From Swiss-Prot:
One of its GO terms (biological process) is alkanesulfonate catabolic process. NCBIfam families: alk_sulf_monoox, PRK00719.1. This is Alkanesulfonate monooxygenase. Its EC number is 1.14.14.5. Signal peptide: none annotated. Homotetramer. The lineage of its organism: Bacteria, Pseudomonadati, Pseudomonadota, Gammaproteobacteria, Enterobacterales. Catalyzes the desulfonation of aliphatic sulfonates. It is an enzyme of class 1 (oxidoreductase). Belongs to the SsuD family. Keywords: Flavoprotein, FMN, Monooxygenase, Oxidoreductase. FMNH(2) which is absolutely required for this enzymatic reaction, is provided by SsuE. It catalyses: an alkanesulfonate + FMNH2 + O2 = an aldehyde + FMN + sulfite + H2O + 2 H(+). One of its GO terms (molecular function) is alkanesulfonate monooxygenase activity.
């Protein structure tokens, strides 16, 4: 099985060390463009663009990277409760059309009550997943070309439709990650690829089996992906030294503040990440070559695969054997590490190198009439 390898655009900051200004670097459009173009040339399938108040807007960043890349895909967040599904469907179709079919979408429900309140969202965990399920139903149906009437608990639309369809059919793939039961049920019923954070293989296997069984109950099959950091060097010793350097400027106060911030979220996945290290620096290798040091101060994906190319490739293949075909990777700093992963790791894997998409012909059309329909040429009999 060929593997889809993704990289990451660090729109929330970048540097050589975690939890300090030491070794940090400015992240501007030029720097993000360097990373995107490196990923494009090295054969990554795409890049994940993060979302949240600590990040630049993912949609605007993705749109700005389309003209400077050729085959790279952009995995961009959909935010139920923050955005209406009809607006999100129009945005998704436009991004897919402008990128010539290089748009992917990541459903993000949110987990920090404080940040959500700042966005005007006051739903609890269960309610957010109810709203996300309704959002996804409407979003998918619009991209499938339906005219949608929907009267849900959280979302109400009447006569919603999409005049400009996406390039990818039936619609651009939808990714999603969540560890709670309601999250897994949403994934099983509606998404195309389920993402998990980088837990030890036995825990990932358990989660995949749960989601796969729930999908089968809906008569569906879905794909699986994993989100990991990577520290790869020419030797294992060099890789572990690099891992230690990454947290060499961390103090206990910074770790405690970060863990307190993570604790206020209601994310089951974040709780599982925190349990891998319990905020302590000792015994961070939680599984062979799987290191939890990143999660001491970084929310979300908090583990890294550490080693030389063959060693890290062996660990990746262990995850692939569980049914994972997509790996969303990152490393600090992201420009240099994109090259290290491409040069030291990719040669030891069966990497699916994406082709440059050919321009897709669009149907001739006139100007939309009264914001309701588009006149099209009628075939002569």
């Amino acid at each position: 099985m060929s593997l889809n390898m993704f990289w990451f655009l660090p729109t929330h900051g970048d540097g050589h060390y975690l939890g300090t200004e030491e070794g940090s670097r400015p992240v501007d459009h030029g720097y993000l463009q360097q990373i995107a173009q490196a990923a494009d040339r090295l054969g990554y399938t795409g890049v994940l663009i993060p979302t949240g108040r600590s990040c630049e807007d993912a949609w605007l960043v993705a749109a700005s990277m389309i003209p400077v890349t050729q085959r790279l895909k952009f995995l961009v967040a959909l935010r139920p409760s923050v955005t209406s599904p009809t607006v999100a469907a129009r945005q998704a179709a436009t991004l897919d059309r402008l990128s010539n079919g290089r748009a992917l979408f990541n459903l993000v429900t949110g987990s920090d009550p404080q940040e959500l309140a700042g966005d005007g969202v006051f739903l609890d965990h269960s309610e957010r997943y109810e709203a996300s399920a309704e959002f996804t139903q409407v979003w998918r149906r619009l991209l499938l070309g339906e005219t949608v009437d929907f009267n849900g608990k959280h979302i109400h639309v009447r006569g919603a439709k999409l005049l400009f369809p996406p390039i990818q059919q039936p619609y651009p793939p939808l990714y999603f990650g969540g560890s709670s039961d309601v999250a897994q049920e949403l994934a099983a019923e509606q998404v195309d690829l389920y993402l998990t954070w980088g837990e030890p293989p036995e825990l990932v296997k358990e989660k995949i089996e749960q989601v796969r069984a729930k999908a089968a109950a809906h008569g569906r099959k879905i794909r699986f992906g994993i989100r990991l950091h990577v520290i790869v060097r020419e030797t294992n010793d060099e890789a572990w030294q690099a891992a230690e350097r990454l947290i060499s400027h961390l103090d206990d106060e910074t770790i405690a503040k970060a863990q307190a911030a993570f604790a206020r979220t209601d994310s089951v996945g974040q709780q599982r990440m925190a349990a891998l290290h319990n905020g302590k620096r000792d015994n961070l290798e939680i599984s062979p070559n799987l290191w939890a040091g990143v999660g001491l101060v970084r929310g979300g994906a908090g583990t890294a695969l550490v080693g030389d190319g063959p060693t890290v490739a062996a660990r990746i293949n262990e995850y692939a054997a569980l049914g994972i075909d997509s790996f969303v990777l990152s490393g600090y700093p992201h420009l240099e590490e994109a090259y290290r992963v491409g040069e030291l790791l990719f040669p030891h894997l069966d990497v699916a190198i994406p082709e440059i998409p050919q321009p897709q012909p669009l149907n001739p059309q006139g100007e939309a009439v009264e914001n309701d329909f588009i006149p099209r040429r009628v075939a002569q009999s």
